[in-house]
């Protein structure tokens, strides 16, 4: 939702919020505890540069609601561009296979390599954001994403296509990795719930929306190359919008700029609370590469929740090979018409988004502490909806049965996947507030490999088992996953008490 790094999307508490993404921010987990004090607060250091009182207009939290909504819309659009690019490639897989004389599985690598690029991006964009703020890493990421769409669009061989797809994934991870931190900068905890729900809905729904556009483009005279030009056009327009319309929201960057102006005016001793807190290479290696794997093998909550969420993410990208088989090969629909059933899943995702926002706002008033296990009832509900939808989809897939059954089944699949995915992220952030970057890093790494791997074996599974039994297999596995949130809802507090890394209260 890249789903990439995702944030604590609908949290209305004041606990640290790290990133979709995890797929969404790679900021330090103490981002809120490091909020700069204002000059209205007592301070002992006369050279400490802070906000000019609680109503300082330079503080993004004090911008008008309309302006913050505009800035949020830019971030949403950036994520829309890159997430559409992640899956619109699947629409042209048939033409690409014919053009380069390869099998469809080889072409599917274009999706898998894009998602693998998501695993490389966050360890780069997170530290850059901490050092240089949100805006310029976003500018660099979107500009390079746009540039590397071009070689894919004009490629003369498959190698160029695959390398270009990987690089667009690396640079396309920028908005996914940075958006969570920017929303934390602007919105208070209660407001942030809605803002982040919109972002995660975009990140989760855009890959489903992409084939609706891509299939009709490929079926027209424009062909598969225009799907990549479309990604390039969207990325370029977003780059221009970011350069000229996106303000810096990171308090550290704003206050450092203010301190630099004061130094230039004649006071060389001023500083900010953010000075000297940039992470070195060793810190980055430990936080993003070493500690995540250690946590996976020592933290049962992280391990099991990551497996569950990775399975959900894998199903999301498996859809882009299973739907063409179910509707084009089995039912004989045209390329464009075969994309319309994705609408059912989109509706389900929107329903899931609404449920999560409403229930979270009901549970958290912004003034009371979050109990991590309060996230789990929605995860359990989503986990129950998912196999129901998969079984409906599976056993109405016979071409002699009306197609409406499969579309209806797609809706609970979308709702269930969204609810499980979102609440998995929220639960991990609540359980591991002080090491959320590492926990989400481990989660993202495993999740991205599932997302990259499922489209590779999906065609073999659906061709060998048939649509009914292949989808039913996913349904049975989904049922087997339901005890995970049930276990933690019943015994989560006790399990957390065994860990030195988790929140115990």
From Swiss-Prot:
Q: Which InterPro entries does the UniProt entry name for this protein?
A: MFS (IPR011701), MFS_dom (IPR020846), MFS_trans_sf (IPR036259)
Q: Does the keyword Iron apply?
A: no
Pfam family membership, one: MFS_1
Which UniProt keywords are listed? Membrane, Transmembrane, Transmembrane helix
Q: Does the keyword Transmembrane apply?
A: yes
Return the PANTHER family for the record: MAJOR FACILITATOR SUPERFAMILY, TRANSPORTER, PUTATIVE (AFU_ORTHOLOGUE AFUA_5G00420)-RELATED
Q: What does this protein do?
A: MFS-type transporter; part of the gene cluster that mediates the biosynthesis of oryzines, natural products with an unusual maleidride backbone.
Task: Output this protein's name.
Answer: MFS-type transporter oryN
Naturally occurring in which organism (per UniProt):
Aspergillus oryzae (strain ATCC 42149 / RIB 40) (Yellow koji mold)
UniProt gene name: oryN
């Amino acid at each position: 939702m890249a789903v990439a790094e995702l944030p604590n999307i609908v949290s209305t508490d004041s606990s640290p919020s790290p990133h979709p993404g995890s797929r969404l921010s790679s900021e330090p987990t103490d981002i809120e505890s490091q909020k700069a004090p204002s000059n209205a607060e007592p301070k002992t250091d006369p050279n400490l540069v802070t906000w000019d009182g609680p109503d300082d207009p330079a503080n993004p939290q004090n911008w008008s609601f309309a302006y913050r909504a505009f800035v949020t819309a830019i971030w949403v659009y950036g994520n829309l561009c890159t997430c559409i690019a992640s899956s619109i490639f699947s629409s042209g897989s048939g033409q690409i296979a014919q053009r380069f004389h390869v099998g469809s599985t080889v072409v599917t690598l274009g999706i898998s390599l894009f998602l693998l690029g998501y695993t490389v991006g966050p360890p780069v964009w997170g530290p850059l954001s901490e050092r240089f703020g949100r805006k310029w890493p976003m500018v660099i990421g979107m500009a390079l994403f746009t540039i590397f769409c071009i070689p894919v669009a004009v490629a003369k061989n498959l190698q160029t296509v695959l390398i270009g797809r990987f690089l667009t994934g690396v640079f396309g991870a920028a908005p996914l990795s940075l958006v969570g931190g920017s929303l934390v900068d602007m919105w208070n905890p209660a407001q942030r719930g809605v803002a982040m729900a919109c972002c995660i809905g975009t990140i989760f729904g855009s890959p489903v929306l992409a084939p609706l556009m891509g299939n009709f483009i490929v079926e027209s005279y424009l062909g598969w190359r225009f799907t990549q030009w479309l990604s390039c056009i969207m990325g370029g327009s977003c780059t221009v919008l970011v350069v000229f319309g996106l303000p810096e929201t990171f308090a550290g960057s704003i206050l450092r700029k203010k301190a630099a102006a004061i130094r230039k005016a004649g006071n060389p001793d001023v500083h900010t609370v953010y000075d000297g807190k940039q992470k070195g290479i060793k810190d980055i290696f430990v936080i993003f590469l070493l500690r995540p794997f250690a946590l996976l093998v020592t933290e049962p909550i992280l391990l099991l929740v990551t497996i569950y969420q990775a399975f959900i993410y894998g199903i999301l990208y498996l859809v882009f090979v299973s739907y063409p088989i179910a509707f084009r090969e089995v039912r004989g629909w045209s390329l464009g018409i075969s994309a319309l059933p994705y609408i059912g899943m989109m509706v389900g995702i929107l329903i899931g988004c609404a449920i999560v926002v409403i229930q979270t706002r009901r549970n958290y008033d912004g003034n009371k502490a979050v109990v991590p296990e309060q996230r789990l009832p929605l995860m359990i509900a989503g986990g129950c909806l998912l196999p129901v939808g998969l079984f409906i989809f599976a056993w109405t897939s016979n071409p002699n049965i009306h197609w409406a059954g499969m579309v209806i089944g797609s809706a609970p699949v979308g709702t269930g996947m969204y609810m499980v995915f979102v609440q998995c992220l929220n639960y991990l952030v609540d359980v591991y507030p002080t090491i959320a970057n590492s926990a989400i890093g481990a989660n993202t790494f495993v999740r991205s490999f599932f997302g990259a791997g499922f489209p590779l074996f999906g065609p073999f599974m659906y061709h060998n088992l048939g649509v009914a039994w292949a989808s039913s297999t996913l349904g049975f596995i989904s049922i087997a996953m339901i005890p995970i949130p049930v276990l933690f809802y019943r015994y989560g507090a006790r399990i957390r008490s065994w860990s030195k890394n988790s929140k115990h209260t």
